[in-house]
From Swiss-Prot:
Disulfide bridge positions per record: none
Official protein name in the record: Small ribosomal subunit protein bS20
Gene: rpsT
SUPFAM superfamilies found in the cross-reference section: Ribosomal protein S20
Keywords: Ribonucleoprotein, Ribosomal protein, RNA-binding, rRNA-binding
Biased composition (Basic residues): 7-20
Keyword Ribonucleoprotein: yes
GO cellular component entries: cytosol; small ribosomal subunit
Length: 91
């Protein structure tokens, strides 16, 4: 356990940041899950709306370092591919 005052402060800061980052990661997962649910329901309009809402959140979390930029790009690419496939299947 931390003994010096500075080590105690750093431990407190690390815990605070960890819980805040966990909350942000959870938020990103929720946005992604909303898009996936709309895709599974084959609701193109709802999927596009959810995707439009999710993209800026995913980008913002990648900029902050909450998720890796490649992971953000991978999520966006795969979700968009599913939505496009849903659009061609509906047409």
């Amino acid at each position: 356990m931390a003994n010096s005052p500075s080590a105690k402060k750093r431990a407190k800061q690390a815990e605070k940041r960890r819980s805040h980052n966990a909350s942000l990661r959870s938020m990103v997962r929720t946005y992604i899950k909303n898009v996936v649910k709309a895709i599974d329901a084959k609701d193109l309009d709802k999927a596009k709306t959810a995707y439009t809402a999710a993209v800026p959140v995913i980008d913002r979390m990648a900029d902050k370092g909450i998720i890796h930029k490649n992971k953000a790009a991978r999520h966006k690419s795969r979700l968009n591919a599913h939505i496009k496939a849903l659009g061609t299947a509906a047409a």
